[in-house]
Amino acid sequence: DREGAGKHIQAGAKKVLITAPGKGDIPTYVVGVNAELYSHEDTIISNASCTTNCLAPFVKVLDQKFGIIKGTMTTTHSYTGDQRLLDASHRDLRRARAAALNIVPTSTGAAKAVALVLPNLKGKLNGIALRVPTPNVSVVDLVVQVSKKTFAEEVNAAFRDAAEKELKGILDVCDEPLVSVDFRCSDVSSTIDSSLTMVMGDDMVKVIAWYDNEWGYSQRVVDLADIVANNWK
């Protein structure tokens, strides 16, 4: 929160970049989505979560091209340090279970946090996380209802266009039948698995996107820090 991060300012830091979702009124920026709105007046900012960094870029494309009415997201996420290696105590009883032995359903604020960088989507997205026994790389499964009728090839074409233009280096599209380990050390925020894109009844769209929740996210932290440095006054 602002009080906790503010201790760094009190100790002499000029800026604080939180590498996690911020609380309260802390401004949130996602590179490729709204980072161009960064103001030098912001002393404490958040780079959101790795999952929001994966989700927001391709959600932005979907909303701009087809208009998102509502949707849900599931991230199948490698287990993290906030879980227990052995069954033990935790405020979340599911995270209390042995992380390397279980699929652990738990909460995530990633979908709702998209509204912090794309305000027009406030109240339209929600989701959960499934923590799984893999060391790295995660995958988002998004299902949305859209206002414009479409089909899978058109959806993938929109992603390809964005990946080659305004979201180059942020979004990628993969046509190969790959698995999670193939996306280790991927520099982009999200990679669309084109063969898994589905459209039901011409207005319900399902998109699968891979992301390296460690390395890929770290790249965006560096990018945002660079934006802060380049706007120094």
From Swiss-Prot:
Superkingdom of the organism of origin: Eukaryota
Example of a GO cellular component annotation carried by this entry: chloroplast
Catalytic activity: D-glyceraldehyde 3-phosphate + phosphate + NADP(+) = (2R)-3-phospho-glyceroyl phosphate + NADPH + H(+)
Lineage: Eukaryota, Viridiplantae, Streptophyta, Embryophyta, Tracheophyta
Binding site for D-glyceraldehyde 3-phosphate: S49, C50, T51, T80, R95, T108, G109, R131
Site positions for Activates thiol group during catalysis: H77
Natural source organism: Sinapis alba (White mustard)
Entry's family note: Belongs to the glyceraldehyde-3-phosphate dehydrogenase family.
Keyword RNA-binding part of the UniProt annotation: no
Name the UniProt record assigns to this protein: Glyceraldehyde-3-phosphate dehydrogenase A, chloroplastic
SUPFAM superfamilies: Glyceraldehyde-3-phosphate dehydrogenase-like, C-terminal domain (SSF55347), NAD(P)-binding Rossmann-fold domains (SSF51735)
Active site: C50 (nucleophile)
